[in-house]
Amino acid sequence: MTLLIKSIDDLARQKFDVFVPTMGALHAGHQSLIELAKQKGDRVLVSIFVNPLQFENKDDLAKYPQTLDADLKLAEAAGATAVFAPTYKDIYPDEITKIDAGEIGKLYEGASRDGHFSGVLTVVKRLFDLTKPSVAIFGEKDFQQLFLIKQMVKQLNIPIEIVAAPTIREADGLAMSSRNVRLDKDGRKSALIISKALKENSIADMHKVLAEEPGFTLDYLEIIDEDTFLPASEGSKNKRAIIAGWVNGVRLLDNKRMGGAL
């Protein structure tokens, strides 16, 4: 049976090999992270903490689904050893020292969500300090977040291996996200334009596909160099298309590894 840990003192009595940080509202995408974690170590800890620091929009924070009972069942089914569900005071007991996300943290998601990545890095660093795992699992769907966490771990010499897990999709191609439950029937249909666009092989063709769907409002579409997170050039070895926008006021993200010419 999966153990529920609610206090830092109880957490300190335990030792875990692999850590999967989440904000709850777990779905099959999170399940895949936990299952991957089980391949990396015997004792897997999942955290559930909705981090206020990464929400610029307080209304967005208020609407974020919180489903602890269902989350515990999914975590147990996926093989988690324990779930850590701390309070705000556990994570931020004193004055908060925020981590600067740097110049890359101001681009793309960072440009649209002021302070978002500083909030992400701050909570991840705090959770790392508390949980002390050997390995941590993060999904590729939030690719800029993954890049910045890897950068932070390298810069601060944190002795944790960051493992990237592939994006899990619904049967129709939509990238799984806790926010998808906020889409109505028409919005759900409009959202499919994102994965449809990513099937194209050039950014120009992606824009053409996106223009077909009036229900989708584009924020950004870019092909970046995975090693720098700056716009890719012909010499870039590892390229990835990243996209974000809104459907029904719900922000959606996706990305795809690219090959060939720009």
PLM features: residue spans?
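Phosphate/ribose-recognition catalytic cores of enzymes acting on nucleotide-derived substrates
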Residues: V209-L262
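Nucleotidyltransferase catalytic core that binds NTPs
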Residues: T2-G215, I224, T228, K256
